[in-house]
Curated annotation (Swiss-Prot):
Signal peptide: none
Keywords carried by this UniProt record: ATP synthesis, ATP-binding, Cell inner membrane, Cell membrane, CF(1), Hydrogen ion transport, Ion transport, Membrane, Nucleotide-binding, Translocase, Transport
Compartmental location: Cell inner membrane
Name this polypeptide is given: ATP synthase subunit alpha
Lineage per the UniProt record: Bacteria, Pseudomonadati, Pseudomonadota, Gammaproteobacteria, Pseudomonadales
Cross-referenced PROSITE patterns: ATPASE_ALPHA_BETA
PANTHER family, per database record: ATP SYNTHASE SUBUNIT ALPHA, MITOCHONDRIAL
Amino acid sequence: MQQLNPSEISEIIKQRIEKSNVAAQARNEGTVVSVSDGIVRIYGLADVMYGEMIEFPGGIFGMALNLEQDSVGAVVLGNYLGLTEGMSAKCTGRILEVPVGPELLGRVVDALGNPIDGKGPINAQATDAVEKVAPGVIWRKSVDQPVQTGYKSVDAMIPVGRGQRELIIGDRQIGKTALAIDAIINQKNSGIRCVYVAIGQKQSTIANVVRKLEEHGALQNTIVVAASASESAALQYLAPYAGCTMGEYFRDRGEDALIVYDDLSKQAVAYRQISLLLRRPPGREAYPGDVFYLHSRLLERASRVSEEYVEKFTNGAVTGKTGSLTALPIIETQAGDVSAFVPTNVISITDGQIFLESAMFNAGIRPAVNAGISVSRVGGAAQTKIVKKLSGGIRTALAQYRELAAFAQFASDLDEATRKQLEHGQRVTELMKQKQYAPMSIADMSLSLYAAERGYLADVEVAKVGAFEQALIAFFNREFADLMARINVKGDFNDEIDAGLKAGIEKFKATQSW
């Protein structure tokens, strides 16, 4: 046998190394090291990217969320009970996508877009990424078209525009979902497509919402995305992004859409659970450091986009049309504490908030909208002209009434002006009450506001204000149908409409005693 000296040995090793193709070795396969609480640790997968889909045996998928030096932390989408240590895991090279398009309207789907309503498969023609970058500043347009919620208190004092993010915030069981559902019901003839995302709710509650939408003819215009309380934290975390992608389909094609997130507090809790299981360091209230980004990247996707954006997106197929996605996120507070971590985050991200107060709700004022701390930062420019003109004194009357009511408890005798202000405030408060599932048209709303603004309620008993309003609206829709139709179509306020409303109310009061 030939003897090799050390220099020859090193030369042979160098040649062998040069000939071997290390780069061609597979780096996109790994081994499951541990499985617990829906979190999988995988050794290997050197080429995996953040947010990439990982495939396990048996058609189970996960999503890579933690990329560490020698392992990957992934969250399993769906049932993880079939996964065991030692199983193989593969990179797919794809990010999570959900079906989009008009085929989803009228259906109930889970966070991955699979139908769960028993009505058969959905033959969607397209899919789109769940996580997308929001449109840039250059592609956006200012909010100047209204979204009518059908609630007097909201449309008059806290108007919502197309492309706005308006937060609905309040304690549990106070009417937050009811307000959002009524806003969806009111869009059935407006051309605005709706998406309702239920996060961490009871399945009975979701079924009730779907039934109510169907009863009022609004389900055919709505996509319901449901990640109920029994679903994994991963699906509750992903559901809002999936719903947003489905809504963006309409926005990007020059249509208008409305999305309700019910509610983002539960999404934050699900994300906190995932982050703690992934051993990320906890911060305030044990939430991870990026919980603000969790909501900001979601809510920034709601926007009004320009004609150029729509034209560029559709390759010239749609021209001269703007698109919008309006968001109504819901946040649940604990004992009215709006200064907690998640509520303050979402208040700072959104363009205003509708604050519902439990004291008002318990006093029978429903919707329990607190006009004092509720605000719409951009909706004023989008408000219908007639409603804007007639609602100017409503917020002031309510604010003054609340201040005087507190003061009047201590004062024994009040002067005439103060007494009149108090009585006017009581009547306006009564007028702002509205039943659930009874959204109002612009004309009906304008008539109520006109009666309050011009002092026609002054001689009506406080207890009879609601009945007076209903009788007045019924009278106008019967006797002055043309005027009401004109207000609904145009939404303008001029001397002719002013005179018509005045003459009609005077005729009503002359023929009926209140």
